[in-house]
Each structure stands twice: as structure tokens, then as C-alpha cells.
């Protein structure tokens, strides 16, 4: 008996070990394929396979890359030096066009798989990194970006790459990563013309935070100042207002989140951008306010707007809860890892925290059309777009069922009505027929009586003659 118990326990232990092991959990994850890469030019292959953003291999229009795998290739992951123009990928006798989404880090699926692929360029391009993968789900560090949101549950405005993590990161990990909501990030400053590596780090940090929709960015340079007035001399403020207003109208967010009006540690650029967002949410519903974007996207009145460190209607997010979708890490742990992706900025003193003066957990409700908060949830009094779609679908299904029931009831009523009419008509016919028979009987009876009367009179006359 004891031996049986031991055997059962051993089997259960083996079952738990096998089915909880990382190998079992990851058996459908794609692995990197060993490849031979051949360039049509004299470029250096090692510079686009060394995993560094500081090296690249350049190509001219018409150049090509041939990638041959030891096993079938089912996806490519390319990190471009700059956002590419359109390019083509040929395999298995077909040619497809890519580069249409404007992704700096581009993931391309090849559903049927191919042993040999050819990339052909239509303009001058450069690649920092290229990887090929087998069949299966893309590894977690491969950025399979979705296009920017059609409609955003939450629109996060950040001045620079890394501000969204240091000061607004709890929003990204909690609502974008854990709750898988439509979170869109929009930056003011671009680094393509000044520090290209920060464009790569921006994407790496967002992906680590759980964001899946590709960010958008203004075309404003990164300039430092220590006051709002100084920043307004560096930038054309109306251009910034136009950008923030257009972005709000484009994504129609249910919630807007942006930085501190005082610029966190006093950065004039942060002040400028947060003030622009604050002004835009007040006026984006007016058609006369930047009418070009109103004509293009329509107007929009943002239901809720939060500002970092805003003193009124304060909320404090709980960033110490384990997030199941984020490997059971807390938001603080996720954002700490995300900030480390900004390798070029690690010399700065900044760090991710929810318990110091620039806490990424502290916000204030700057503006609302749906009432104040009673808790610490930015989505309080908000119905997300996915929920709205679900409600509309259920409503449409209910209306369809009700319409079907009404149509069926109407059909039954028509049948009953027709049956009743038919019955009434049949009744009338029976009555008429009966009346006719009665009339015939009466006529026959009258004729018979008349005949009897004639016969009686004849007998009476014969009797008199006798």
C-alpha cells in the first residue's frame, strides 16, 4: 500500500515538473535559424549581425541580400538604421512589398516558409541587425509591432524618449502591458537627426513595457531649457499645439496622460509640451481650433485628462502589484527593466520610482467630462473601446433576435388571421348553402302542396259529377 502511494506521488511530481517546465511552455516559440547571408555589393555582413545599433551595413537602390537558411525560414526581423522606404522580399517564386508601415524595427512573417529569401532595395538603405527564425511564435524580445491605434483607450504624450518610462511608466505597464488596452504613445521630440540610437532605445523600452502599437513622433528637435518662457523662444508654440491637437483628434482617446506642468525637474521642454496638451484638450472639440486637423479627423472632446504630479483630484497608482501578463513582475520592476533599454542615457541620475518627488505613480485629474474619481483607476467612469464594441455587438444581436421574434410573431398572427378569415368565409358559404337548400325545400314543399291541392280539387269535381 505504501509503495503504491510513493508511485502515485512520483508520477504526480513528474507530471508537475514536465508541464510546468519552461521547455514545455516555450516549445512553440520560434528559434533563430542559422543562415548564410550573401550581399550583392561589397558590404560587411558582420556589421548587421553583431547586435549593435552602432554598426550598420549600407545598400544602394537596386542592391540585394540573399538569405539562405539551413532550415526553412518562417520570419525575418530587421532593425533598420533609419525608417526604410518600400522594399521587396522574394521567395518561392513570389515577390512581396514591405516597408509600408514606417517601422524602424520590422518583423516579417513568411507563413509557408522558405529556404532562400532575397531582399531588394528601391532606395538607399542601411541595416543594423538582421535575424531569421523558424516556425512558431516570435520570441518575446522580437518586436512584432502593430500599426498605431485607430482609436486609443489611453493616449500618452511624452516629450522625449525615456520620459514615458521615468514619469509615466506605470500607465504603460498597468494599462498597456497587463490589461492589454489600446495604449498609444506620442512623442514631441525626434532623435533621427541628432542621436539615432535613441530611436532604437525608444522602441526597445516601449516593447519591454508591454506596448504593442507603434508610437508616433513629432518633428521637433531635442532642445534644453529651464523655463516655459525660454522653451517658447526655442520652439514655435503654435506648431506644438497643432501637433497635440491633431494627435488627439486622430486617436480620439478616452484618457489622455501627459507630463508635469512644472516640467518635473524643471525642464522647459516638458513644461511646453504638457501646457500644449492641456490647452489642446480644452479646445480639440471646437472645429475652428486648428481647422485643418478638424477637417481631416473630426473634432474630439477628451473624457479624462491626467497630468503627472498635478495637485488637484490626485490619484496614486499601485505599482507594487504583480502583473501576470508581465511575468509576475510589478510595474516598477517592468519600468526599471524598460529604462535600462535606454543604454545611452544610463549616465544620467534618473531612475524609476514610486516613492520620490518625481514618482511615476502620482497623477492628478486635470479635466473630466465623466465625473471625478473615487479610487485610483484612470479608467473609472470609462468604457473602453473594446467594451463599447462588445456592448454594441450584444445590442445588435439582441435587436436581431428581437426582430426575428417579432417577425415570427407577425407571421403567426398573419396565419391566424388568414385562418380566421378562411373560417369565417367557410362559415358564410355553409350558411348560404344551407339557406339555398332550405329555399329549395320550401319551394318543393310549396309545389307539393300545390300539387296536392290540384289533385284534391280534381277529385272533388269528379265526385260532384257522380
Regions found by a protein language model. Give the residues of each.
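Cytoplasmic C-terminal tails of single-pass
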Residues: 455-466
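Bacterial N-terminal signal peptides
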Residues: 6-18
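Active-site rim/loop-helix segments in enzyme catalytic domains that contact anionic ligands
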Residues: 37-67, 82-85, 89, 93-250, ...
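Short Gly/Thr/Asp-enriched flexible loops that form oxyanion-binding sites at enzyme active sites
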Residues: 265-281
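Sec-dependent signal peptide cleavage junction
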Residues: 16-27, 428, 447-454
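Proline-aspartate-enriched helix->loop->beta-strand connector
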Residues: 244-265
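Selective detector of the "anchor" transmembrane alpha-helix that sits immediately C-terminal
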Residues: 430-449
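The feature marks non-catalytic terminal segments
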Residues: 28-56, 69, 87, 103-110, ...
Amino acid at each position: 500500500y505504501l509503495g503504491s502511494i510513493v508511485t502515485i506521488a512520483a508520477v504526480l511530481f513528474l507530471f508537475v515538473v514536465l508541464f510546468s517546465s519552461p521547455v514545455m511552455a516555450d516549445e512553440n516559440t520560434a528559434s533563430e535559424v542559422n543562415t548564410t547571408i550573401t550581399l550583392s555589393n561589397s558590404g560587411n555582413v558582420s556589421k548587421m549581425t553583431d547586435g549593435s545599433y552602432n554598426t550598420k551595413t549600407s545598400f544602394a537602390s537596386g542592391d540585394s541580400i540573399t538569405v539562405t537558411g539551413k532550415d526553412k525560414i518562417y520570419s525575418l526581423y530587421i532593425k533598420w538604421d533609419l525608417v526604410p522606404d518600400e522594399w521587396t522580399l522574394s521567395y518561392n517564386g513570389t515577390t512581396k512589398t514591405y516597408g509600408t508601415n514606417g517601422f524602424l524595427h520590422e518583423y516579417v512573417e513568411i507563413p509557408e516558409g522558405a529556404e532562400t529569401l532575397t531582399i531588394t532595395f528601391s532606395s538607399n538603405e542601411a541595416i543594423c541587425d538582421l535575424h531569421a527564425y523558424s516556425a512558431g511564435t516570435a520570441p518575446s524580445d522580437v518586436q512584432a509591432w502593430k500599426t498605431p491605434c485607430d482609436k486609443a483607450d489611453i493616449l500618452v504624450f511624452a516629450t522625449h524618449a525615456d520620459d514615458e518610462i521615468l514619469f509615466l511608466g506605470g500607465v504603460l505597464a498597468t494599462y498597456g502591458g497587463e490589461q492589454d488596452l489600446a495604449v498609444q504613445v506620442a512623442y514631441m521630440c525626434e532623435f533621427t537627426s541628432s542621436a539615432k540610437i535613441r530611436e532604437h532605445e525608444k522602441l526597445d523600452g516601449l516593447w519591454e513595457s508591454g506596448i504593442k502599437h507603434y508610437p508616433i513622433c513629432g518633428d521637433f528637435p531635442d532642445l534644453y531649457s529651464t523655463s516655459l518662457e525660454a522653451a517658447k523662444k526655442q520652439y514655435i508654440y503654435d506648431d506644438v499645439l497643432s501637433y497635440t491637437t491633431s494627435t488627439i483628434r486622430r486617436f480620439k482617446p478616452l484618457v489622455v496622460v501627459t507630463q508635469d506642468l512644472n516640467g518635473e525637474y524643471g525642464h522647459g521642454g516638458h513644461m511646453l509640451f504638457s501646457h500644449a496638451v492641456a490647452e489642446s484638450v480644452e479646445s480639440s472639440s471646437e472645429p475652428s481650433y486648428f481647422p485643418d486637423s478638424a477637417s481631416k479627423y473630426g473634432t474630439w472632446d477628451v473624457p479624462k485628462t491626467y497630468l503627472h504630479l498635478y495637485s488637484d483630484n490626485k490619484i496614486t497608482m499601485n505599482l507594487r502589484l504583480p502583473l501576470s501578463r508581465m511575468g509576475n513582475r510589478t510595474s516598477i520592476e517592468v519600468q526599471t527593466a524598460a529604462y535600462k533599454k535606454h543604454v545611452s542615457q544610463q549616465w544620467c541620475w534618473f531612475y524609476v520610482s514610486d516613492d520620490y518627488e518625481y514618482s511615476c505613480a502620482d497623477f492628478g485629474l486635470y479635466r473630466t467630462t465623466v465625473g471625478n474619481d473615487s479610487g485610483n483607476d484612470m479608467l473609472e467612469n470609462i468604457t473602453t473601446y473594446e467594451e463599447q464594441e462588445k456592448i454594441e455587438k450584444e445590442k445588435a444581436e439582441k435587436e436581431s433576435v428581437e426582430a426575428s421574434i417579432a417577425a415570427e410573431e407577425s407571421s403567426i398572427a398573419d396565419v391566424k388571421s388568414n385562418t380566421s378569415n378562411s373560417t369565417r368565409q367557410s362559415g358564410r358559404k355553409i350558411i348560404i348553402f344551407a339557406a339555398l337548400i332550405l329555399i329549395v325545400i320550401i319551394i318543393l314543399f310549396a309545389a307539393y302542396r300545390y300539387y296536392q291541392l290540384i289533385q284534391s280539387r280534381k277529385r272533388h269535381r269528379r265526385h260532384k259529377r257522380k
